[in-house]
Amino acid sequence: MIELSSHHNYWLVEPRGALSRDDFAAIAKQIDPVIESDGRVEGLIIKTRNFPGWESLGDLIEHFRFVRDHHRAIDRVALVTDTPLAHIFPAIAGHFVSADVRQFNFDDYDAAVAWMRSSGGQD
């Protein structure tokens, strides 16, 4: 399960348990109309103290499909988490996605929001 909320120039995604296909469908249902009307989504903040993983291998594959289908339309992604090894995610993601990806510690959520705002929008 996830909580998804829209802010002026970014979307906040907060996983509340292992990720599922339904979670990615829910995110797409909200951001796809924005992409269709505006051509892009300025930012996505993924906030979770510890990454919850996926319910199944099929859900992991659905996550990869979501990234494949949306990465060109999202300008920035902030991963706000204390998950071990999260700091290497931006370097790895840089090889596969067009978005500018940065990692912030969970307690540095305000810094992630400030980074999103620096792209030109306000909360």
Model-predicted segments: where are they?
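Amphipathic, Lys/Arg-enriched alpha-helical "gate/interface" segment within cytosolic domains
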Residues: M1-D123
